[in-house]
Amino acid sequence: MVAKTLYGLEDVLATELTALEAEEVTVGRRMVSFRGDKRMLYLANLRLRTALRILKPVITFHAKTTDEIYERLRLFDWTTVISSDQTFSIDSVVYSDSFKNSQYISYRTKDALVDFFRDREGKRPSVRLSNPDILLNIHVSHEEVTLSLDSSGESLHKRGYRVAETTAPLNEVLAAGILLKAGWDGNTDLIDPMCGSGTFLIEAALIACNIAPGIYRRGFAFQRWADFDPDLYDELFHDDSAERVFDHIIYGSDILPQAVAAARSNVERAGLGRYISLSVLPMQQRPKPESKAMLVMNPPYGERIKVEDMQQLYTMIGERLKHNYAGCSAWILAFKPEHFNHIGLRQSHREKLMNGALECELRGYELFEGRRDSFAERKSRRAEGEQGVGRRIDRRDVSAGREKRSNSMDRENKPPYRSPRPDKPFRTSDNRKKEHNDEQQRETRWPNDRFRSSDESERGPRKSSSKRIQVIRNDE
């Protein structure tokens, strides 16, 4: 089977499938393949938080043209997946240089199905784009074609608890994936200071209480399959043995009253009001949390929700995180790199995620008092400081001894300096001044004396020297 997901959530989905005890879990591009029975198929639809669809492959073959696809599907026994009285729709996904038009592949698949039933029974199933009985999926990778049954029907991100929404609501699968990547397990409080219609809040409560996200849905496509087992499904649907108690609080706030009203309606529909506290409050006015908490937020990008000054918004976020949430962790989904630059904090986690058609980034921050230093660095500096105290004491002892030695030498009674050369007399301050004046007079009379031989000194300066200097000046 195949579980489809959003770009960047494949690793989280694989972890979820492993926890469900699925076999042969393999990560692919926006999908994770696995093996399992009918029970696993039902569980995957009910309990996976980061899956969009669960597909059950029925036939795989190779083809180079759309005509080959038609011929192979024309020979397939369609009665194993659909009857002539049912409705259907076809979704196609293509990753191939040989096939450019995914919609045309859907048309050719429909032709093969209709021609099969018309030749066999004289009647054909009807196409219904909205809520069909059977949803088919054609996946083309290079020249490999796979026909699958879509067991989910509507995308699994449509949980069923959303009865109200705001502009640009966050995808439920994406929200759950971000929380799982952040390591949310319900062991602390959680805060969303820009909660919108409450997607993060509800998904966080479902994870904390380990409530299956699929219990709010009206149904799944596999319930209309010929081999549907209602007893098995009812057993799994009503099994709440894995649910747990959540002892913390999830706080949600927003500056817009209508957003908080929408969030409250959705929270009530999900039956999670006892875990979630809502308020109309800008982020600047949120009080400091009483204990360690996790912050998660999806601020406006400036695309669909217009904000007058994006730089000011994200700068404010960074300032509030730094000064109000020390000891907490924060996870932010944003669209443009400059948004994070305005936050001005060093991230501990960074990766790309898709929010609809927008390529966004998720960044995580560990918030510390003052500078962002790791505990190991702080411990190292503390140890060095303790050792430095001992070193400073030693230096003070040495300095104190040096000061005593300096004071013990009376400069006024110090004997005159005696040159190590035997032909030099004792030097007093008057002698040193006289020697210095004589040296200056010699330098004035013969500036080049020190560079001349003894013969030249007797004759005086060379006459050609001034000419040589003049030539040099002319050349310059």
Where does each model-flagged region fall?
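A short, flexible beta-alpha/helix-coil linker loop
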Residues: 95-98, 154-155, 300-304
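Short, charged/polar, Gly/Pro-enriched secondary-structure boundary elements
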Residues: 39-46, 154-157, 371
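Conserved S-adenosyl-L-methionine
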Residues: 170-288, 303, 311-313
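SAM-dependent Rossmann-like transferase core, predominantly class I methyltransferases
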Residues: 147-181
